[in-house]
Each structure stands twice: as structure tokens, then as C-alpha cells.
């Protein structure tokens, strides 16, 4: 199963909009984070309580920041925090419904 979320990450430079794509294989997660013109590889696990534990870089024009992100998923809404050596960033996101994904592909 693959899902896409429209996400907003509250970075030190202000809010950043992007798309988080997640593919589930049991409790294992792979995917990508398309943010500020860069596509970052995502991997992680889905915990028994429904929490997503993701590991990924966030690439910018000046650096690549390794992050650990913990997200709570409730009724198609994501909320959580990314932690890196230099910062903590709050996340919010909403599920992009399959019908909207199909229309945008046309």
C-alpha cells in the first residue's frame, strides 16, 4: 500500500511545503520526501501503536541534514517532530486522497 501526504515542516527558515510518499510492507516503510526541490529517501517502521518512526535526510541548497522523524497518524492527518543534530522541526500533514493523486497525474 502506498500513501501520499501534503506536509508542512516548520523549519528554522520558516514553513516548508512538500509531499511525503510512504509505501508499507508489513511494518517496514520506504518512500520519499519531496521538499524544496529535492527528493529525499525515507525508510522506517510502523510501530504497533500506529506511530511512524522515519529516518531520512533533508537536503537543502547548502547542506544535507540527517533526521529522525516521529509522526502520529490519525484519520489521515500526520503530526510530529523531526530531530537532527542542529534542530527540531514540527510536522503537519494530510493524506492526499487517491482520486486527487490520479487527477494530478493526468
Q: What do these predicted regions represent?
A:
Residues 1-75, 79-106:
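Central antiparallel beta-sheet cores of small beta-barrel/beta-sandwich binding domains
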Amino acid at each position: 500500500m502506498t500513501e501520499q501526504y501534503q506536509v508542512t515542516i516548520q523549519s528554522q527558515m520558516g514553513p516548508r511545503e512538500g509531499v511525503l510518499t510512504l509505501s508499507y510492507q508489513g511494518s517496514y516503510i520506504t518512500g520519499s520526501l519531496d521538499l524544496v526541490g529535492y527528493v529525499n529517501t525515507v525508510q522506517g517502521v510502523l510501530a504497533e501503536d500506529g506511530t511512524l518512526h522515519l529516518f531520512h535526510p533533508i537536503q537543502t541548497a547548502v547542506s544535507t541534514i540527517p533526521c529522525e522523524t516521529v509522526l502520529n497518524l490519525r484519520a489521515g492527518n500526520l503530526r510530529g517532530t523531526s530531530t537532527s543534530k542542529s534542530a527540531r522541526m514540527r510536522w503537519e500533514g494530510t493524506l492526499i486522497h487517491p482520486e486527487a493523486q490520479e487527477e494530478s497525474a493526468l
